[in-house]
């Protein structure tokens, strides 16, 4: 079995050495292994830039460490330009995953393997996720994946069979040159910050950003340079929380956001970027992170107030994958209806309200086609769903849009459109299958995100369509009435603000959005 997960023995005690400065730097940066700060916080590696032929860093008193902390170091000028010499891409092989099991499901795993053996199909197993032992409690996020050779239709799984290579060369503003095989570490001076220039921002422009902690520059899978921030969890969250939720939100909502973001950081270890020399990226794919200088004292206070607190499954299954979205539109969605896979008992879609609201709106416990139009007629109000109550609800709780038919037809590539029909919805009414008919044929689009993109980047897949046709049966206009913004799974951020505004605590907020789980202070 190919093992991707490592056992990380996590404790609040001070680490005696920096694990990221061990003898084999590349092995460590490609692994799921954590290092820890002296005061017992995990250090997370986040990619902030990649696919660059060269990068420029600056800081007063910067140290260049070819072998990490404890090895030789160079103190040069304040500005360093780093490039890759003779960079060679890594080699990645993609497998088709046909089944996934918990490590304890040995009988089911063996039955699956036997089924494929009987068909004379070669299989391999891969282990993803991580196993954490924290203060005597084991948190297991591992899954055993079964890949079947020569098959299609499953989930692609990348395996790094050959690491990228090259010489990383750094030159300072005095002409000092430092070279090392595949990686160089940079540690800041007294300010604790390193400046990185020409970072791509969310608008596609380039800007200078500052980062807490260390940066390492290494060869990425394209044979170019990746810049990775090895940042203590509290510093990372201090930047993440106000990027994900307005710092003017009530304190209890910010605390709920801090816990959810912390869970997301740790729950994703070993499940994403499996072929990359870092654990997470700084985009929406993982969590948005723009470095230092984006902190707000109110969000930082929420991070500090919930230090080490994580959502743990009641069944002992490990950390909750505490996903969240901007606005659920008043009803959450099940994880499997958005991303497929196994239903997660902690990510069940339900009415975004208390028992009194549920008693008032019993027919919306599950929203099917028949109820959806009535549901979308509900306007923001102070006695409605949690996400209908705060002022933030005005933007996304309910919305309307007229489709740009020419643009939609160009994307769908079935000729002039004749029909758009939602044929399957999730428990919140979100579309999960859309049937499209045009002069050039028909097709089916699966997945709420793919449907949103196909129809012109709709805010959410909780919508109904009103179609108008000409005498020849072609669509002449499509009006969309919708609710919410985002996938709707897990915590509704506007709903959290609404709950906090009604006097609910962050513990109650988390209980509303993540069932079958409880809070534990683990470090």
Predicted regions mapped to residue ranges:
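Conserved, single-site charged/polar hotspot
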Residues: 6, 15-523
